[in-house]
Amino acid sequence: MKFGIIGAGMIGHFHAKAITAMTGGTLHSVFDLRQEAADKLAHEYGAKAFSNIAEFLAESELEIVTVGTPSGAHLDPTLAALKAGKHAIVEKPLEITIPRIDELMSAAEENGKTLAAVLNRRFHPGMDAFKKAADEGRFGTLASASAYIKWYREQAYYDSAGWRGTWALDGGGALMNQSIHTVDALIYLAGPVKSVQATTVCLAHERIEVEDHCVAIIEFENGARGVIEASTCTWSKDGHPARVQLAGTDGSAFLADEAFEIWDFREEKPEDIEIKSTLMKGQEAGLGANDPTAINFHQHQRNFEEVVAAINEGRQPSTSATEARKSVEVITAIYESAQNNGKKIFV
């Protein structure tokens, strides 16, 4: 399947690496309003470059696009792609409000095209094992389900682009931008959220409109309770791993980035031996805790391969727009709660 990239910034480069490495896809073209940026990325991968989106989408060989523009600028290029008859994979968040996401979903349905998201933290062996355990009910009655994203961003990060730290284009701060993948993982594992209560604050950065620290209490539909803590002002030399922790009456599993800190179940299975020997080796450095460029592209690769396979098989991908909508719904509810003095908001 021939891919086109919309947005030749940092994320566009990750997309290009993933597309080049994947099975079932090749990079056909790159679009960016900045012709120089489009030329540079396209030249590196032997693709065509465009600075006119209509000309980019008019390419008959182009079948699917990835969208890596700023978060609050996903709507227009994705709508254009869907209406031009292209499938679309959109970076996180799918969009920054539920009405915008619903508009995209309607356009995909009307044009008979697949709309999917980049939910790349779902695609590694640790998450595969975690999801299997959750689906098999190995935790018993789930009591606790929490996510902790204690990351750090220098002031220079926010100053590097005018859209960073704005409601209009970033959609939020530490929670919406840095933490959405981990929030998605929490919902993916623990199930639907019933209500949230939250507080947010900007503690350590200037010239931003949004939060750099957030704490939310979460109530799940299954009765479990938990916490989401998201920050870009918690420094550590090597960076704190993003953590997802589930615990219930029959078991507990604590995941730190891609490795387990705890994997303990009342009823052990043969697979637990392998999981403990291969997936409990300490957290892998360089997953974006301190440096947003220090992430690998392999999870993006698996994400893209899953979407292509779903299209070829005539099914919805596991990272469908419906799935991507869930984390944005929870995050926007958290913001609503924080803006109303911690009022309980039902999702």
Q: What kind of feature is each model-predicted range?
A:
Residues 64-71, 75-122, 137:
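Beta-strand-loop-alpha-helix segment that lines the small-molecule cofactor/substrate pocket
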